[in-house]
From Swiss-Prot:
SUPFAM superfamilies: Translation proteins SH3-like domain (SSF50104)
Family named by the database record: Belongs to the eukaryotic ribosomal protein eL21 family.
HAMAP family assigned: Ribosomal_eL21 (MF_00369)
Subunit relationships: Part of the 50S ribosomal subunit. Interacts with protein L18 and binds the 5S rRNA. Has been cross-linked to L18.
Lineage: Archaea, Methanobacteriati, Methanobacteriota, Stenosarchaea group, Halobacteria
Name of the protein in its database record: Large ribosomal subunit protein eL21
Function according to Swiss-Prot or TrEMBL: This is one of 5 proteins that mediate the attachment of the 5S rRNA onto the large ribosomal subunit, stabilizing the orientation of adjacent RNA domains.
Annotated spans, Disordered: 1-66
One of the GO BP terms on file: translation
């Protein structure tokens, strides 16, 4: 029987915390502020289900284009096409 190709197929590693990172995430990460035009890395925090983006975009880098409620609109280029992802601060890391 063929395996299903559901939306979370192949995400065992992306949606699993390392043993040292298990439990609740640091609250500073969820309330971090980002400015428009700032470069950010998309990294899913498995401990935070809200504001998560599709796992296919995990690991990409984009530019913050503004806020939508408590979340941020991040522009990325996926396969030569510009896309806008809406994601909360818990899943964003500032590029240094």
């Amino acid at each position: 029987m063929p395996s299903s190709n559901g939306p979370l197929e192949g995400t065992r590693g992306k949606l699993k915390n390392k043993p040292r990172d298990r439990g609740t995430s640091p609250p500073q990460r969820a309330v971090e502020e980002f400015d428009d035009g700032e470069k950010v890395h998309l990294k899913i925090d498995p401990s935070v289900p809200n504001g998560r983006f599709h796992p296919r975009f995990d690991g990409q880098t984009g530019t913050v284009e503004g806020k939508q409620g408590d979340a941020y609109k991040v522009d990325i280029v996926d396969g030569g096409k510009e896309k806008t992802i809406i994601v909360t601060a818990a899943h964003l890391r500032r590029q240094e």
